[in-house]
């Protein structure tokens, strides 16, 4: 029985996302481990999709039931999350206010005019640029935005950064784990490792709960892209505990089942290293799989490096969770002007 059976879901995605073998990337990494990708970057027709839609599917019913008329959320200037909240609001007929903080020390001349923020505005969201820097916690700028909607006579529905510390924020990726388990039956094998980027925490947190039900939570390897490891780990822990209780997992998730690798977040959140850029190019040139410099490029870098170092035993089958994020590339065009 699904852990999610009792929860209402508002469909924003096409359904189960495909799992794709990546033979050319596998070969480029020496062929000792088989690399696959689960394509959550291709999960919806809503504004290029991405992982946040899995989360929002379980949040929207609560938003509608609350009688809200405005979704209010927060992210960085090139936030995938605020793009997805804007898309969701447009789809369900609500207004949208998003705070876009300057989380990233990146100064491309078009950074605040292209990619995610452009699409967010195009979908009618009230996008408010704020100078505050990076922090995955609850932000005053977001609380002020919620209050501003109330002051104008509206009824806001608050969605935190990444939809992560929302009470239903982890449910979507519990569903991801159940979906992978069903697909493994068709594939005829079980993945040895799942690689996923982690920043605000509910994507990996939900996966951990879902795979804990299968006694495989420690095979979910989070690649930190926040650069604030302890804060991220603490938030993942809270999300895991809250989500476990919500879905009646029936046991506590052990500390050793929460695996986060901090080695690839440098030099800062939202700033790619040369190794990140090399990973982005390798995925693009072997598999035409586009990753971004903020999140997926760093998790791709991590997976590539771990494979080359021999972290995965020979013969392992590794599943890369592609969470989306390609629109952000437009804000980093100078890095890739020559490919």
UniProtKB/Swiss-Prot annotation:
User: Which InterPro entries would you find in this protein's record?
Assistant: ACCD_DCysDesulf, ACP_carboxylate_deaminase, ACP_carboxylate_deaminase_bac, TrpB-like_PALP, TrpB-like_PALP_sf
Q: What class of enzyme is it?
A: hydrolase
Question: Can the keyword Hydrolase be found in this entry's annotation?
Answer: yes
Question: Molecular function (GO) terms listed?
Answer: 1-aminocyclopropane-1-carboxylate deaminase activity; D-cysteine desulfhydrase activity; pyridoxal phosphate binding
Q: Which cofactor does it need?
A: pyridoxal 5'-phosphate
Keywords, A to Z, come to:
Hydrolase, Pyridoxal phosphate
Record field: catalytic activity: 1-aminocyclopropane-1-carboxylate + H2O = 2-oxobutanoate + NH4(+)
Among the record's GO biological process terms, what is one?
Answer: 1-aminocyclopropane-1-carboxylate metabolic process
EC annotation from Swiss-Prot or TrEMBL: 3.5.99.7
A Pfam family of the record is PALP
Q: Which Gene3D superfamilies match?
A: 3.40.50.1100
**Catalytic site:** 79
Q: Indicate the family of this protein.
A: Belongs to the ACC deaminase/D-cysteine desulfhydrase family.
Protein's name according to its UniProt entry:
1-aminocyclopropane-1-carboxylate deaminase
Q: Which organism does this record belong to?
A: Rhizobium leguminosarum bv. viciae
């Amino acid at each position: 029985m699904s852990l999610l059976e009792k929860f209402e879901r508002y469909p924003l995605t096409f359904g189960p996302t495909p799992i794709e073998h990546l033979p050319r990337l596998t070969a480029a990494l020496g062929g000792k481990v088989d690399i696959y990708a689960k394509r959550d970057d291709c999960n919806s027709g809503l504004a290029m999709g991405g992982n946040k839609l899995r989360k929002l599917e379980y949040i929207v019913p609560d938003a509608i039931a609350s009688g809200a008329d405005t979704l209010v959320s927060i992210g960085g200037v090139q936030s995938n999350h605020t793009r997805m909240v804007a898309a969701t609001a447009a789809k369900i007929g609500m207004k949208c206010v998003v705070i876009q903080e300057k989380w990233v020390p990146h100064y491309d001349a078009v950074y605040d005019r292209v990619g995610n923020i452009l699409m967010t505005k195009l979908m009618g969201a009230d996008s408010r640029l704020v100078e505050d820097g990076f922090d995955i916690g609850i932000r005053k700028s977001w609380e002020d935005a919620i209050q501003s909607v109330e002051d104008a006579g509206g009824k806001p529905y608050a969605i935190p950064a990444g939809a992560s510390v929302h009470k239903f924020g982890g449910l979507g990726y519990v569903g991801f784990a159940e979906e992978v388990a069903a697909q493994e039956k068709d594939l005829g094998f079980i993945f040895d490792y799942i690689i996923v980027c982690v920043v605000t925490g509910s994507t990996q947190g939900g996966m951990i709960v879902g795979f804990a039900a299968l006694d495989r939570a420690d095979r979910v390897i989070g690649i930190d892209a926040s650069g604030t490891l302890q804060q991220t780990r603490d938030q993942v822990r809270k999300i895991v505990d809250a989500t476990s209780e919500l879905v009646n997992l029936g046991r506590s998730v052990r500390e050793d089942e929460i695996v986060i690798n901090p080695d690839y977040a440098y030099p800062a959140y939202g700033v790619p290293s040369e190794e990140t850029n090399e990973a982005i190019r390798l995925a693009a040139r072997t598999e035409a799989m586009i990753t971004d410099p903020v999140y997926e490029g760093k998790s791709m870098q991590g997976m590539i490096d771990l494979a080359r170092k021999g972290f995965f035993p020979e013969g392992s089958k590794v599943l890369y969770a592609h969470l989306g994020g390609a629109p952000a590339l437009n804000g980093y065009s100078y890095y890739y002007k020559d490919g």
